[in-house]
Structure formats: C-alpha cells, structure tokens
Regions:
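Pyridoxal 5′-phosphate
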Residues: 3
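Short coil/turn connectors at secondary-structure junctions
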Residues: 47-50, 71-74, 97-99
Length: 123
C-alpha cells in the first residue's frame, strides 16, 4: 500500500473491489445496511453509539474530525511538519471555519510543551 496524499495515491485493488461490490447493494447515504453495519462496528470498537460520516478523501476526514472540537476563534496545535499543515492545503481553514493551525516545534516532528508554548504565544 502507498500512504501518499489521497490526491496522488492509487486505490488498493481490494478496496476498489469492495467499493464495486457495495455499489450493487442498497441506496447510499446512511439508510443502507452497509452504513448500519459500520455504525455498529465502530460503536462496538469505541464502546458507545456511533454515527459514521462517510467522506471521499482523507483531507475531508481529517478536517471534519477537527472541526467540531474547535470554535472559529480557536486553534489546533500541531507540529509544523504535521501532515495537516504540510499536505492539506487550505482545507483546514475552510473546514475549521477560520480556526488556525498553531504550529509547534519539536525534535523528530514531535511536539513538546516548550514548542506548544512558543506556538500559541502569538495568540
């Protein structure tokens, strides 16, 4: 498997086959058996009821996961070499409704308390 950007990496053949098989079943958009099975599986994994939101790209998944956790006047702390900073383009600003990525430093792309303090200091 290649874990490149979702805009450049090919779809794995097994995933492609699973999508073809799913396309021949129920109507999409959460009223189907496949969505219900996924909700149940994630609920069992996390120990609570889950409603899975299907999205087309990893960029959308990353940004939609952060959006509910951060108000428009807030920020998300990440390393300045984090995937969301380096590879997601303008998507975080759009999906976070203006909230900022607050860039922190740290050795080997791991944030440190000092890096966080320096990253949020300009606020």
């Amino acid at each position: 498997m290649q874990f490149l950007s979702d805009n450049a990496a090919p779809v794995h053949p097994r995933l492609w086959e699973a999508m073809r098989a799913a396309d021949a079943t129920d109507a999409p958009y959460d009223g189907d058996a496949l969505s219900a099975r996924l909700d149940d599986a994630m609920g069992a994994l996390f120990g609570t009821e889950c409603a899975v939101l299907w999205v087309a790209t990893g960029t959308a998944a990353n940004c939609l996961a952060l959006g509910p956790m951060c108000p428009p006047h807030g920020g998300v702390v990440c390393h300045r070499e984090a995937h969301i900073e380096m590879d997601e383009g303008g998507a975080p600003g759009f999906y976070l409704h203006g909230a900022k990525l607050l860039l922190a430093d740290g050795e080997h792309a791991k944030i440190t308390p000092e890096g966080i303090a320096a990253g949020i200091d300009p606020i």
